[in-house]
Design a protein with these regions (language model features):
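Alpha-helical scaffold/interaction cores of sigma-54-like transcription cofactors
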Residues: 1-464
Length: 464
């Protein structure tokens, strides 16, 4: 696919971070499904061991730029960006602009100020907008009868709201993308217009999607505070107990430090501890709801933690009782056809991951993995016309596209349609297993330190 240079660039700055003691996450997003990422040390997750799919990362039938997001220690992320600037030249590296927009409450206050209306009046109207994500003024008028009444009876309110609705959603100000960095072969200003932020940082004047459309190389350097906590906890353990703990060991490599202790990801004591729900401070597992879920789940493997992180989200949460019942009562699990069993057995008969949708259409209907990723994408983005067309292909096949179809594989029409319906329902919310696996490793690492070295872990957590 011609991405050798891309992987080498990513490997280079990750290698710089590791060799300079800057904590790097085990992986993030679909890149953890790449064996090349694993063997080069870009990620620490073995995709074969956890059955992660490469085509979820790069699809040979829908060629796009790879997207490897990397988590670094929150406090030292800037050092990695500085290294990239020095290596490739300040003229060839830039951060990316973002545009803040006039949202419902903000636009009312801004328009009111321009109209010279009293601040208290505008603030009262703005506070009547419900605190809902992506709320619009029009939706607020439908949801709040009091606001609707004022709009219909007060000319000042009506003028303010009508003008605000016309401006709602327009760009208000610029800021810098929290993670995006662009690297170019020639001077950046030969490709895109640039600007200088208030702190002197050079940024593109094009947003991230435009940068990607132009074919420029975009990387995401993210800061994850938990990595700092883990590093500080490991340092305190060595200082207090003389024990070195290697959290970044990759299985296929020779262990370079014979004195270091490796974390056992099948440690029953750590898994049982997670199952007690005493996971305050444990990455991804510290909310009240997640603690209760862990008490019900009682994970027995890292796979259970991966599934837990994937399920505890709006939508998939409805399947938690079925998942737990299947885990505890294996005899209660049923499959529409025998071909589903090896795919869904690890998740007790439930579709939990996007990768499982891909495996189902490949194994049952004969899609290629590239075609399977395309249908997974269509389902997650709710492209109904694609979903309807693919149902025909899934059930009956499509000779022109090389799809055999379920019926040709001995699966009944009724069962095939039922399986397809369940995929459509769940694919809207299904989680990327590669990302869940990487973050489950971080969750487990924090639980490991909290269980075995609670003093050092809590000191690191409070310091951060």
């Amino acid at each position: 696919m011609g991405y050798v240079d891309y992987f080498l660039i990513v490997w280079d700055f990750i290698n710089y971070a590791r060799t300079h003691g800057i904590p790097v996450g085990p992986g993030r997003g679909s890149a953890a499904g790449s064996l090349v990422s694993y063997t080069t040390g870009i990620t620490n997750i073995d995709p074969i061991k956890y059955n992660l799919l490469f085509e979820r990362f790069l699809n040979p039938e829908r060629v796009t730029m790879p997207d490897i997001d990397i988590d670094f220690c929150y406090e030292r992320r800037s050092e990695v960006i500085d290294y990239v600037v020095k290596k490739y030249g300040k003229d060839c590296v830039s951060q990316i602009v973002t545009f803040g927009t006039l949202a419902a409450k903000g636009v009312i206050r801004d328009v009111g100020r321009v109209m010279d209306l009293p601040y208290s009046f505008c603030d009262t109207i703005a506070k009547m907008i419900p605190n809902e994500l992506n709320i619009t003024i029009e939706k607020a008028l439908q949801m709040n009868p009091e606001l609707r009444g004022m709009y219909e009876s007060d000319e000042n309110v009506r003028t303010l709201i009508d003008m605000s609705k016309r401006l709602e959603g327009l760009p208000r100000h610029t800021s810098m993308h929290a993670a995006g960095v662009v690297i170019s072969q020639k001077a950046m200003d030969e490709y895109v217009p640039l600007s200088r932020a208030s702190d002197g940082t050079i940024t593109t004047q094009f947003i991230m999607t435009t940068i990607e459309e132009l074919g420029l190389l975009k990387m995401d350097f993210l800061g994850l505070r938990t990595l700092t906590v883990i590093k500080d906890a490991a340092d305190l353990v060595y200082k207090n107990h003389g024990i070195k703990i290697d959290v970044n060991h990759i299985d296929y490599n020779d262990h370079t430090d014979p004195d270091a202790v490796l974390i056992d990801y099948n440690d029953k004591k750590v898994l049982d501890y997670i199952g007690t729900g005493r996971t305050e401070g444990v990455f991804q597992l510290e909310s009240a709801g997640m603690k209760n879920f862990m008490k019900e789940l009682k994970p027995q493997s890292l796979e259970d933690v991966i599934a837990g992180i994937s399920l505890y989200r709006p939508g998939p949460m409805d399947f938690i009782p079925k998942y737990i019942k299947g885990k505890n009562e294996r005899d209660s699990i049923t499959y529409e056809c025998k071909e589903l069993e090896p795919i869904l057995e690890p998740t007790y008969g439930c579709i939990v991951y996007q990768e499982q949708v891909m495996q189902i259409v490949q194994e049952l209907a004969g899609y290629t993995m590239g075609q399977a990723d395309n249908i997974r994408r269509a389902m997650s983005k709710k492209k109904q016309y694609v979903i309807d067309a693919e149902r025909q292909n899934f059930v009956y096949g499509n000779e022109e596209q090389g799809i055999k179809g379920c019926i040709a594989n001995g699966i009944s029409e009724q069962a095939a349609n039922k399986i397809y319906d369940s995929m459509v329902d769940f694919a809207k919310y299904a989680f990327n297993k590669s990302h869940a696996a990487a973050y489950a490793v971080v969750s487990y690492q924090t639980a490991y330190f909290k269980y075995y070295y609670p003093v050092e872990f809590m000191a690191a957590l409070m310091t951060s």
